[in-house]
């Protein structure tokens, strides 16, 4: 059971963590370069959540690289328990931030038509950042489920 896809110390685990880093960084970059994002709390929360996700995933990707390089086994019950809790916490935060930002973006574009009334708002970048945040969440959810699946077998 220790050969679960995405488990720590494997190539698939490292690829999953690096995918999380790239998509979280891209989401942060898209939102940070959008005009007026700091006026809306949901967008600031998205930046903070993706920043936390980036740090968490980068740290675990570095741990995966170290494990692959030194041939160390990371399938320790204490370590995997920490990974499970961290993955689930960051997954919930990422999903909440992406959902809140998606709600504000839809409100601006479809309900109150802020994007037409105020063309200086970067509604396209808001939407791009939200899509990237949901992609990040899908990667972290995959990782959280694989860690949770691995835990009982240790």
From Swiss-Prot:
It is found in: Cell membrane. It comes from Zea mays (Maize). It comes from the Eukaryota. The lineage of its organism: Eukaryota, Viridiplantae, Streptophyta, Embryophyta, Tracheophyta. This is CASP-like protein 5B3. It is a multi-pass membrane protein. InterPro entries: CASP_dom, CASPL-5. Glycans are attached at residue 39. Residues 38-42, 99-129 are extracellular. Belongs to the Casparian strip membrane proteins (CASP) family. Keywords: Cell membrane, Glycoprotein, Membrane, Transmembrane, Transmembrane helix.
């Amino acid at each position: 059971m220790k050969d679960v896809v995405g488990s720590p110390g494997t190539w698939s685990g490292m690829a999953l963590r690096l995918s999380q880093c790239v998509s979280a960084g891209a989401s942060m970059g898209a939102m940070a370069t959008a005009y007026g994002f700091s006026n809306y709390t949901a967008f600031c929360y998205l930046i903070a959540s993706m920043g936390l996700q980036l740090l968490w995933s980068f740290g675990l990707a570095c741990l995966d690289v170290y494990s692959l390089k030194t041939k160390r086994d990371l399938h320790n019950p204490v370590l995997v328990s920490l990974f499970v809790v961290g993955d689930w916490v960051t997954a919930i935060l990422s999903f909440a931030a992406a959902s809140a930002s998606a709600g504000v973006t839809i409100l601006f574009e479809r309900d109150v038509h802020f994007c037409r009334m105020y063309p200086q708002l970067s509604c396209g970048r808001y939407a791009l950042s939200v899509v990237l945040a949901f992609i990040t969440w899908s990667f972290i959810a995959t990782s959280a489920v694989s860690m949770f699946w691995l835990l009982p077998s240790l």
